[in-house]
């Protein structure tokens, strides 16, 4: 848990100048002005930090539920997750069509792929809805938003559920110490991932 907090703080500190600079270089800086762009950039970093906290809490409990369910849906979604995650990483954030040059369907699919690769959830979606509204973006931005919402549902139902299913093997040998060790290792890995994710 300590690494989650460290990752959140570190990511926010790194993310504020990064997101602010990115926002100031974007076309929205012309519409919003430098002052408002700086505020939006800081808000984006804080939203990501807040999202991380909520993610860990929600995914922990839903992951335990998925572990008990043991449904075939988990395996189907995991396969879909791998495919969309790879595509999302390849396409990266630059695929966001904020100037209406593409179709709504392309934007929708981009939102799904990038959203899954970035652990999008409903809390970030709510913030980004306000962000897109402030930035004056048109329907393409909301199409990305809709795709990101779908991705958020997928990520909640799948990723942590699969992790807990893997770590359930430690419980089968009835070793509480081994199970706790596995959970701690998972938390450390996720904490490191948070730091790296926000630093890149």
Model-derived segments and spans:
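Small-residue-rich segments of transmembrane alpha-helices in multi-pass membrane proteins
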Residues: 45-48, 102-119, 180-190
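Small-residue-enriched transmembrane helix starts and helix-helix packing motifs
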Residues: 1-16, 38, 42, 91, ...
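Selective transmembrane alpha-helices of multi-pass membrane proteins
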Residues: 66-95, 149-160, 171-200
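Juxtamembrane transmembrane-helix termini in multi-pass membrane transport proteins
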Residues: 2-65, 127-143
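Hydrophobic alpha-helical transmembrane segments in multi-pass integral membrane proteins
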Residues: 54-56, 114-126, 187-200
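C-terminal ends of transmembrane helices
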Residues: 22-32, 89-95, 162-169
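Membrane helix-loop-helix hairpins that form the core translocation module of multi-pass transporters
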Residues: 34-101, 106
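Membrane-embedded alpha-helical segments of transport systems
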Residues: 43-54, 118, 150-157
């Amino acid at each position: 848990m300590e690494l989650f907090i460290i990752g959140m703080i570190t990511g926010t500190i790194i993310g504020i100048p990064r997101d602010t600079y990115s926002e100031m270089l974007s076309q929205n800086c012309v519409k919003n002005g430098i002052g408002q762009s700086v505020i939006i950039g800081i808000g984006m970093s804080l939203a990501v930090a807040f999202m991380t906290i909520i993610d860990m809490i929600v995914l922990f409990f839903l992951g335990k539920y998925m572990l008990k369910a043991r449904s075939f849906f988990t395996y189907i979604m995991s396969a879909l997750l791998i495919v969309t995650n790879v595509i999302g990483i390849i396409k990266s954030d630059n695929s966001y069509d904020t100037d209406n040059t593409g179709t709504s369907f392309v934007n929708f699919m981009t939102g799904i792929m990038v959203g899954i690769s970035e652990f999008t959830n409903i809390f970030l979606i709510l913030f980004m809805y306000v962000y897109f509204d402030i930035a004056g973006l048109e329907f393409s931005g909301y199409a990305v938003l809709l795709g990101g919402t779908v991705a958020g549902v997928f990520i909640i139902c799948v990723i942590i559920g699969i992790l807990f299913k893997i770590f359930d093997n430690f419980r089968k040998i009835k070793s509480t110490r081994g199970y706790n060790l596995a959970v701690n290792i998972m938390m450390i890995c996720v904490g490191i991932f948070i730091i790296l994710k926000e630093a890149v």
